[in-house]
Amino acid sequence: YKILFKRAFNDSIATSQKVSLALSQFVRSMVSYQSKFDEGLAHTNDPRRPFSNFTNSENRGKQLFFSPQTNCAQCHTTAAFIGDNSRNNGLDAVLTDLGVGGINNRNNDYGKFKVPSLRNIEVTAPFMHDGRFTTLEQVIEHYNSGVKNNQYLDNRLRQGNRVRRLNLSTSDKVALKDFLLTLTDRTFLTDEKFSSPFN
C-alpha cells in the first residue's frame, strides 16, 4: 500500500488520518444510480408515471410502492430509497430488542431501527435488523399481513388504533417484488473498483 499512499498523499507513510480520509473518499464514491429504475426515471422525470422500459408488472409494483395503499415511499423517501429517521415497523408485539430506545433510553424510540436503502436489495439478504427474513417475499408479506401491534408502532403502519393491513393480492405482491428488483444496479455490483483487493 505504500505506493498507493504515495500516489494519493504524496507521502508513503500510512497514518490513521490518511487511512480515514482514504476510506471516507472510497465510501463516498460508492454511488448506485444506474439501475433499470434510474433509466426509466431519466426518461420521464416522474416516478409516478409509467416507465417505457418497465414490464407491466414492474410498473404496477412501482405504482403500489408510491401509493397511499402501501405507503412504502413514506419511509423510503430519498433517491437512495432510504429513510431519514428510525422507525418501529412492527416486527414484534413484545419488544425484546429495544433498538434506538435501548441506546438513548427514550420510550418513544423503543423498537425503532434505521430504515435501510432499497438500492440493490436483491443482493442484500437477510432482511430486517436481525436478519429474520431471507426473501423479499417474506418482507412483503410482513408488511401485507404480519405487522405486529405494539405501543411504539410507527403511525404509518396504523389505521386508528389498529394495524394497517395492505390486503395485497398475489399478483400485487409479485409486482411489488418485481419493482424492487428494478433498483438493482448491475454496473455497480460488477465494478472492479469495488471488488475485493485480496483476490
Residue ranges of model-derived segments:
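C-terminal capping alpha-helices of c-type cytochrome domains
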Residues: 2-7, 11-35, 122, 132-199
